[in-house]
Structure formats: structure tokens, C-alpha cells
């Protein structure tokens, strides 16, 4: 009996999570994360040669 209740709850949760949703909020969040990733990548591209140069001076 408990298994049936648990199974029903799992199925309902899966339907809620995997059902069709509007892409508005998740798309905006994804774009913000992508933009932050691009900023980090660009900063790393600018900063790594400088760090390598400083390390070479220390030798």
C-alpha cells in the first residue's frame, strides 16, 4: 500500500517537472548564466598572459 502511494507521488512529481512549461523564465536565466560565463572567459583570456609574464619575470 505504501509503495502505491509512493509510486503515485513520484509519477505526479515527474509529470509536474517534465511537463510543458513556458520557456520565458528559464531562457532568461540561461542567457544570464551564459553572459556571466562569457565575461569570465574573456577576463581569463586577458589575465592569463599577464600572469604568465609575471611568472616568467620571477624566474
UniProtKB/Swiss-Prot annotation:
Leucine amide: modified positions: 57
Highest rank taxon of the organism: Eukaryota
Pfam family, one: Cecropin
Primary subcellular site in the record, as a coarse category: secreted
Keywords of this entry: Amidation, Antibiotic, Antimicrobial, Immunity, Innate immunity, Secreted, Signal
Protein location: Secreted
Signal peptide limits: 1-23
Gene Ontology terms: cellular component: extracellular space
GO biological process, one term: defense response to Gram-negative bacterium
Keyword S-adenosyl-L-methionine set for record: no
Family as reported in the entry's similarity comment: Belongs to the cecropin family.
Function: Cecropins have lytic and antibacterial activity against several Gram-positive and Gram-negative bacteria.
Protein name as catalogued: Cecropin-B2
Phylogenetic classification of the source organism: Eukaryota, Metazoa, Ecdysozoa, Arthropoda, Hexapoda
Amino acid at each position: 500500500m505504501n509503495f502505491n502511494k509512493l509510486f503515485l507521488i513520484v509519477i505526479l512529481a515527474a509529470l509536474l517537472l517534465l511537463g510543458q512549461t513556458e520557456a520565458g523564465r528559464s531562457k532568461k536565466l540561461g542567457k544570464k548564466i551564459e553572459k556571466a560565463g562569457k565575461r569570465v572567459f574573456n577576463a581569463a583570456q586577458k589575465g592569463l598572459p599577464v600572469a604568465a609574464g609575471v611568472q616568467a619575470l620571477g624566474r
